């Protein structure tokens, strides 16, 4: 008879991705999508990180303490995106 303890269970939840070239905040593909969108259209290159944060909150019943890594991944993505846009010297619109 085996009982399941927290250390016996495997967490199959996704974890934030680490600096994968495909998930860069400001890749050439994301730059092209941002520059070709209409002015009234909203485009967030960090949408994947935002959705992962929401999924984490949903999985954990809204407990923000359980999702700190996801929030930090989103903040890092947003910061990287804004810094690259600033360095390029382009405006937001």
Curated annotation (Swiss-Prot):
InterPro entries: COX23 (IPR051040), Cys_alpha_HP_mot_SF (IPR009069)
Record key words, sorted: Disulfide bond, Mitochondrion, Transit peptide
Residue positions of motif Cx9C motif 2: 67-77
Any single biological process term in GO: mitochondrial respiratory chain complex assembly
PROSITE patterns: CHCH
GO cellular component: mitochondrial intermembrane space
Domain CHCH per the UniProt entry, residue ranges: 43-85
Disulfide bonds: 46-77, 56-67
Coiled coil: none
Residues in the signal sequence: none
Biased composition (Basic and acidic residues): 8-40
Location of this chain's protein in the cell: Mitochondrion intermembrane space
Primary localization: mitochondrion
Annotated function: Required for the assembly of cytochrome c oxidase.
Stated family: Belongs to the COX23 family.
Name of the protein this chain belongs to: Cytochrome c oxidase-assembly factor COX23, mitochondrial
Gene behind this protein: COX23
């Amino acid at each position: 008879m085996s009982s399941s303890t927290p250390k016996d269970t495997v967490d199959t939840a996704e974890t934030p991705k680490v600096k994968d070239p495909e998930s860069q905040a400001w890749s050439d593909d994301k730059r092209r999508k941002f520059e070709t969108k209409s002015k009234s259209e909203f485009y967030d290159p960090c949408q994947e990180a935002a959705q992962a944060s929401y999924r984490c909150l949903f999985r954990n019943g809204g407990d923000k303490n359980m999702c700190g890594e996801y929030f930090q991944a989103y903040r890092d993505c947003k910061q990287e995106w804004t810094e690259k846009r600033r360095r390029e010297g382009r405006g937001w619109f």
